[in-house]
């Protein structure tokens, strides 16, 4: 049987911008994307710690080392600059293949979205 498990997480990133007029998605600094084992265009769940909003979108490439976390398109209505968010990816795995020591990649960031 397949189960869905958390694959990666960027924990308590700070939203640096929100662009309602962009076509959609979530712009994320590529250093954070790589550290969390995520990919550009991968589906993500986003949880806004400040207002409780939860939504799904996909990642687009942000400049490396910029700390950029930008809510684009309709997602811009679900958060604002300065909000803390959690970005989560998932994977489908065969339950019997899931190692007992499985650990997802979790990236903790500081107030400027630099990996701690």
Curated annotation (Swiss-Prot):
GO biological process entries: alanine biosynthetic process; pantothenate biosynthetic process
Keyword Cytoplasm listed: yes
Catalytic residues identified in the record: 25 (schiff-base intermediate with substrate), 58 (proton donor)
Residue positions binding substrate: 57, 73-75
Pathway: Cofactor biosynthesis; (R)-pantothenate biosynthesis; beta-alanine from L-aspartate: step 1/1
Entry keyword set: Autocatalytic cleavage, Cytoplasm, Decarboxylase, Lyase, Pantothenate biosynthesis, Pyruvate, Schiff base, Zymogen
Residues the record lists as Pyruvic acid (Ser) modifications: 25
Reactions it catalyzes: L-aspartate + H(+) = beta-alanine + CO2
Keyword NAD: no
Annotated InterPro entries: Asp_de-COase-like_dom_sf, Asp_decarbox
Compartmental location: Cytoplasm
Oligomeric and partner information: Heterooctamer of four alpha and four beta subunits.
Stated role: Catalyzes the pyruvoyl-dependent decarboxylation of aspartate to produce beta-alanine.
Recorded family membership: Belongs to the PanD family.
Protein's name according to its UniProt entry: Aspartate 1-decarboxylase
Gene name per UniProt: panD
